[in-house]
């Protein structure tokens, strides 16, 4: 913390923030803390506040526990900003405002007023919120609502003023003076609570607002567009801060059912301790990075690399790529991955494809009144009694006779109902009275029950009506959808194309699996594993073989992959070895945009993701680590979701379930994806996750029979291991 009179410059530390969730249900693990986790995302977003999360905690609705945490974070941790979420309503246990009033030394009523005014323009129920904002020492404390939607909107309302407020509390004289000088230069004051001037040093926070909604309130297009009426005199959230771009998938962030109060940090950022959130796209995505554009002719013409391999002594001793959190890496992959174009296919080839058009029924189903059961078509008005049988109606035939009073017609399931009949009586509710001498015909039957009109008859169009949309655009087709296409007679459909994936392994030490081992050599397993993983999901593949650790060979192999495939996957050559040239070839020769080159995760630290735009067509490049386990884990984490998005699947994220640990598991400083086998015990709702043993990234045996990845949070001072029986999140990677 700055002392009295200290001048802070633009190079001083970031805003240190604590997020405190006040909720009995979240504290007891009966509910997920979606609002608290979402606030952490917003705080850390560089396009918004750009702060760091220095503390995060969940407490019950108890005044003393709330006060104790607030005082500790203000006086001991010396945070700049504390955001509380929850406990601000009218319920008997909503006591957050009372606890806050006992802690603060000065109130900040303007911020509470801004939140109330903004909330009232969203819903009249905003008047039921009782937020308190105030200052203790040099810490600003703000009470936000407990819902994810409400807390995010209120954060948006006060966001434009937060940086300047914190600068004032930190005695950041330089920044404070800059803002004051710019305010003095304005010709007239802005309307109340309008955004600061466009020349404000915090303009990026004005231009990037947040508008999120709960999952149940999301719009069908999965983007939440707030309507802004420029003619209105009311103060709205949009008038205070503009909405940032919609995320790729509008979904809430999940959290592990445990309170991870202390977050571990990397040299460049603070990854979330909650494991599940690593694979949930946050509501506020990172800014889009424009890929470099190249000409296909120029790219494919180059056969000699410009990478200088002679100056070995001048190679990097430390990676030039910053550590990227799993959250940010996953979001970046989905943001930069395009959805491919469409093609027309025969419906029989539609398994696993995604419809690019709505499919409508050409005919009614059934096209005639059809019997639901085997029995007799009757006139309901006749009631019970003996009836003459005038013939039969079978499936596939149209009866020509009309049922008159005192008559019935024998029918089979699915057969057309004859004229004159308006009900079906099942055979079990009848007795045969008379038959032909040879027993080949039924002549008279006794109806034992009173039938009602329409009984056991499917009317015309009962199942499907002509013109009805039977399959919507975006449907991921399986066996039932193929059958439905056949039912309605649609034999050709428009679908998104499948991405073509080219795979190669790199390394001078590699041999093909069929080769005999030579000194210093090993057989290449990565290529076989990656090809099988991609093929298991149904995507066409190209085998580019083994490529030596030579820039020219790498360039030529990449050029071949670029010319033939939509996605190129490499393994090896991305770490810090003197022969690891792949990233240099991508950058120097191909002019690809490398979006990240290191990910804060285990295994898979050197995972690299790049894009290359050639004549308006985007190529996706995944440069995966060379260790076998790292390659297959990162393929499941990054490559498979990207391929699913390319083929048009609306939610490409992997399936994540809850499971119980079968043994104690030690935590690593990095978020870890621990291989496991999921099994269900008799009458237990949750599966058990059994570790596959030694998790060394070179040990492919740890993937044997594995159908899940334990999503383990990073180690903290409070939590160094998880114990047998604890519930964890598991990403499904195989058949259950």
UniProtKB/Swiss-Prot annotation:
<keyword id="KW-0564">Palmitate</keyword>
<feature type="compositionally biased region" description="Polar residues">
    <location>
        <begin position="261"/>
        <end position="290"/>
    </location>
</feature>
<dbReference type="GO" id="GO:0045211">
    <property type="term" value="C:postsynaptic membrane"/>
</dbReference>
<keyword id="KW-0511">Multifunctional enzyme</keyword>
<dbReference type="GO" id="GO:0007529">
    <property type="term" value="P:establishment of synaptic specificity at neuromuscular junction"/>
</dbReference>
<dbReference type="Pfam" id="PF03453">
    <property type="entry name" value="MoeA_N"/>
</dbReference>
<feature type="modified residue" description="Phosphoserine">
    <location>
        <position position="262"/>
    </location>
</feature>
<dbReference type="InterPro" id="IPR001453">
    <property type="entry name" value="MoaB/Mog_dom"/>
</dbReference>
<feature type="modified residue" description="Phosphoserine">
    <location>
        <position position="268"/>
    </location>
</feature>
<dbReference type="GO" id="GO:0097060">
    <property type="term" value="C:synaptic membrane"/>
</dbReference>
<dbReference type="GO" id="GO:0008940">
    <property type="term" value="F:nitrate reductase activity"/>
</dbReference>
<dbReference type="GO" id="GO:0098982">
    <property type="term" value="C:GABA-ergic synapse"/>
</dbReference>
<comment type="function">
    <text>Also has a catalytic activity and catalyzes two steps in the biosynthesis of the molybdenum cofactor. In the first step, molybdopterin is adenylated. Subsequently, molybdate is inserted into adenylated molybdopterin and AMP is released.</text>
</comment>
<feature type="modified residue" description="Phosphoserine">
    <location>
        <position position="270"/>
    </location>
</feature>
<dbReference type="GO" id="GO:0060077">
    <property type="term" value="C:inhibitory synapse"/>
</dbReference>
<comment type="function">
    <text>Microtubule-associated protein involved in membrane protein-cytoskeleton interactions. It is thought to anchor the inhibitory glycine receptor (GLYR) to subsynaptic microtubules. Acts as a major instructive molecule at inhibitory synapses, where it also clusters GABA type A receptors.</text>
</comment>
<dbReference type="GO" id="GO:0005737">
    <property type="term" value="C:cytoplasm"/>
</dbReference>
<keyword id="KW-0067">ATP-binding</keyword>
<dbReference type="GO" id="GO:0045184">
    <property type="term" value="P:establishment of protein localization"/>
</dbReference>
<dbReference type="GO" id="GO:0030674">
    <property type="term" value="F:protein-macromolecule adaptor activity"/>
</dbReference>
<keyword id="KW-0966">Cell projection</keyword>
<comment type="similarity">
    <text>In the N-terminal section; belongs to the MoaB/Mog family.</text>
</comment>
<dbReference type="Pfam" id="PF03454">
    <property type="entry name" value="MoeA_C"/>
</dbReference>
<keyword id="KW-0472">Membrane</keyword>
<comment type="subunit">
    <text>Homotrimer, homodimer and homooligomer. Interacts with GABARAP. Interacts with SRGAP2 (via SH3 domain). Interacts with GABRA3. Interacts with GLRB. GABRA3 and GLRB occupy overlapping binding sites. Interacts with ARHGAP32; IQSEC3, INSYN1 and INSYN2A.</text>
</comment>
<dbReference type="GO" id="GO:0061598">
    <property type="term" value="F:molybdopterin adenylyltransferase activity"/>
</dbReference>
<dbReference type="GO" id="GO:0010038">
    <property type="term" value="P:response to metal ion"/>
</dbReference>
<dbReference type="GO" id="GO:0098690">
    <property type="term" value="C:glycinergic synapse"/>
</dbReference>
<feature type="modified residue" description="Phosphothreonine">
    <location>
        <position position="265"/>
    </location>
</feature>
<dbReference type="GO" id="GO:0046872">
    <property type="term" value="F:metal ion binding"/>
</dbReference>
<dbReference type="InterPro" id="IPR038987">
    <property type="entry name" value="MoeA-like"/>
</dbReference>
<dbReference type="GO" id="GO:0005856">
    <property type="term" value="C:cytoskeleton"/>
</dbReference>
<dbReference type="GO" id="GO:0043546">
    <property type="term" value="F:molybdopterin cofactor binding"/>
</dbReference>
<keyword id="KW-0808">Transferase</keyword>
<feature type="region of interest" description="MPT adenylyltransferase">
    <location>
        <begin position="326"/>
        <end position="736"/>
    </location>
</feature>
<dbReference type="InterPro" id="IPR005110">
    <property type="entry name" value="MoeA_linker/N"/>
</dbReference>
<dbReference type="GO" id="GO:0099572">
    <property type="term" value="C:postsynaptic specialization"/>
</dbReference>
<dbReference type="GO" id="GO:0009898">
    <property type="term" value="C:cytoplasmic side of plasma membrane"/>
</dbReference>
<feature type="region of interest" description="Disordered">
    <location>
        <begin position="260"/>
        <end position="290"/>
    </location>
</feature>
<comment type="similarity">
    <text>In the C-terminal section; belongs to the MoeA family.</text>
</comment>
<feature type="modified residue" description="Phosphoserine">
    <location>
        <position position="305"/>
    </location>
</feature>
<dbReference type="GO" id="GO:0005886">
    <property type="term" value="C:plasma membrane"/>
</dbReference>
């Amino acid at each position: 913390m700055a002392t009295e009179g200290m001048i802070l410059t633009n190079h001083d530390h970031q805003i240190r923030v604590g997020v405190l969730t006040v909720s009995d249900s979240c504290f007891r693990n009966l509910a997920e803390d979606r609002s608290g986790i979402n606030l952490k995302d917003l705080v850390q977003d560089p396009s918004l506040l750009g702060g760091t999360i220095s503390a995060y905690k969940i407490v019950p609705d108890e005044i003393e526990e709330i006060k104790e945490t607030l005082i500790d974070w203000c006086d001991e941790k010396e945070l700049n900003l504390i955001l509380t979420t929850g406990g601000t309503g009218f319920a008997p246990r909503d006591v957050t405002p009372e606890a806050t009033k006992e802690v603060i030394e000065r109130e900040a009523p303007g911020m509470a007023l801004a939140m109330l005014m903004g909330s009232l323009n969203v819903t009249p129920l905003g008047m039921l919120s009782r937020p308190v904002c105030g200052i203790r020492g040099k810490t600003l404390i703000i009470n936000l609502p407990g819902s994810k939607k409400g807390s995010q909107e209120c954060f948006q309302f006060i966001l434009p003023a937060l940086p300047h407020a914190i600068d004032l509390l930190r005695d950041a004289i330089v920044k404070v003076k800059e803002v004051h000088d710019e305010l003095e230069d304005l010709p007239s004051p802005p309307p109340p609570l309008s955004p600061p001037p466009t020349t404000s040093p915090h303009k990026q926070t004005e231009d990037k607002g947040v508008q999120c909604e709960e999952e149940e309130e999301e719009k069908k297009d999965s983007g939440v567009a707030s309507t802004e009426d420029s003619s209105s005199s009311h103060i709205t959230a949009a008038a205070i801060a503009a909405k940032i771009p919609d995320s790729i998938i509008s979904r809430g962030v999940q959290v592990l059912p445990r309170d991870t109060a202390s977050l571990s940090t990397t040299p460049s950022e603070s990854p979330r301790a909650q494991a599940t959130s690593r694979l949930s796209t946050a509501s506020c995505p990172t800014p889009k990075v424009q890929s470099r554009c190249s000409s296909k002719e120029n790219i494919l013409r180059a056969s000699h690399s410009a990478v200088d391999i002679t100056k070995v002594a001048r190679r990097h001793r430390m990676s030039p790529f910053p550590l990227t959190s799993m959250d940010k890496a996953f979001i970046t992959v989905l943001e930069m991955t395009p959805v491919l174009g469409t093609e027309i296919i025969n419906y029989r080839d539609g398994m696993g494809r995604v419809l690019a058009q709505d499919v409508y029924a050409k005919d009614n189903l059934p096209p005639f009144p059809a019997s639901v059961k085997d029995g007799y078509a009757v006139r309901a008005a006749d009631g019970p009694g003996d009836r003459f049988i005038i013939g039969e109606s079978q499936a596939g035939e149209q009866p020509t006779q009309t049922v008159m009073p005192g008559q019935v017609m024998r029918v089979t399931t699915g057969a057309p109902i004859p004229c004159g009949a308006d009900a079906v009586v099942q055979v079990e509710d009848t007795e045969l009275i008379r038959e032909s001498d040879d027993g080949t015909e039924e002549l008279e039957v006794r109806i034992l029950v009173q039938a009602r009109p329409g009984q056991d008859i499917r009317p015309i169009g009962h199942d499907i009506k002509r013109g009805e949309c039977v399959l919507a655009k975006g449907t991921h087709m399986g066996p039932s959808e193929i059958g439905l296409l056949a039912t309605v007679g649609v034999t050709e459909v428009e679908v998104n194309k499948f991405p073509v994936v080219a795979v190669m392994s790199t390394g001078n030490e590699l041999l093909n699996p069929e080769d005999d081992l030579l000194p210093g050599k090993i057989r290449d397993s990565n290529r076989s594993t990656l090809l099988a993983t991609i093929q298991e999901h149904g995507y066409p593949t190209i085998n580019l073989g083994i490529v030596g650790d030579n820039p020219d060979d790498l360039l030529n192999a990449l050029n071949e992959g670029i010319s033939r495939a939509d996605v190129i996957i490499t393994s090896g050559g991305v770490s810090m070895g003197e022969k690891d040239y792949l990233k240099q070839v991508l950058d120097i020769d191909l002019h690809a945009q490398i979006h990240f080159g290191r990910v804060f995760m285990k295994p898979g630290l050197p995972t690299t993701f790049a894009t290359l735009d050639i004549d308006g067509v985007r190529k996706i490049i995944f440069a995966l680590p060379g260790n076998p386990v790292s390659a297959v884990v990162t393929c499941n984490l990054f490559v498979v979701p990207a391929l699913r998005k390319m083929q048009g699947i609306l939610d490409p994220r992997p399936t994540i379930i809850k499971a119980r640990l079968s043994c104690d598991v030690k935590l690593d400083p990095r978020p870890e994806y621990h291989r496991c086998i999921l099994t269900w015990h008799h009458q237990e709702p949750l599966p058990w996750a059994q570790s596959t043993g030694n998790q060394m990234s070179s040990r492919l045996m740890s993937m044997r029979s594995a159908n899940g990845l334990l999503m383990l949070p990073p180690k903290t001072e409070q939590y160094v291991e998880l114990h047998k029986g604890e519930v964890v999140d598991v990403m499904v990677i195989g058949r259950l």
